[in-house]
Amino acid sequence: MDTLKTYYSKRVQEYESIYHKPERQHDLEHLKQMLRSLSSGQSVLEVACGTGYWTQGMAEAATSIIAVDNVAEVLEVARQKRIDESKVTFVKADAYDLAPLVGSFSMALVAFWWSHIPKEKIPQFLRSLHGPLTHNSLVVLVDNKYVPGSSTPITEWDSSGNTYQTRTLSDGSEYRILKNFPKETELRDSVESYAEDFDYKELDYFWIATYRVAK
């Protein structure tokens, strides 16, 4: 099991504590409302759904959601939430190999996963992500900005330009976690061959990028 997967399996009981930071509540409410609006009437693929924090809100508006994660422990928590099971299916799947998923989707949400992708693996992830999507599908990327005093400090850089944080869980265990904070131009360049109508917005603590899948 890789470090990131181990970390999230161990963090499962405190997974959503990050959403309790007082200074981020306004931004989080904005994101919830935005995702409910964007997912209305959509067939959604949610990548790296974690404990279903974002799934729960979208389920009120979406036609259907396939929510995938590669960590069994967080999926167990997600399945315990009050979510319409006729709309939402949680699936254990690898974000880098979404080919086994059955069906096509009119929207994909990648929330707080892009920052964990090593820069050298972004092309592989994008090939995987776009496999189940169709022309004009909406792709929504949401992730953290680096905000001094609120974000966990960066403690390491590697030769590929990836940045790392040292994260400590409530049991005192420490993990070296890859966490990148891309700029708009880097995101735009990464998805350029797949995207049309690219749009990028920044909130105080988060960024949001959307685009339509090009022909």
Question: Can you say where each PLM-predicted feature lies in the sequence?
Answer:
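Conserved class I S-adenosyl-L-methionine
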Residues: 1-39
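Short glycine-centered segments of the SAM/dcSAM-binding site in methyltransferase folds
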Residues: 43, 136-138
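Class I SAM-dependent methyltransferase SAM/SAH-binding core
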Residues: 45, 51-97
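Conserved Class I S-adenosyl-L-methionine
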Residues: 51, 173-215
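A conserved beta-strand element that flanks and buttresses the S-adenosyl-L-methionine
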Residues: 109
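Short catalytic micro-motifs in class I SAM-dependent methyltransferases
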Residues: 112-113
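A short glycine-rich, Lys/Arg-flanked "PGG" loop and its adjoining helix->strand segment in the class I
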Residues: 123-135
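C-terminal alpha-helical "lid/dimerization" subdomain adjacent to the S-adenosyl-L-methionine
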Residues: 142-191
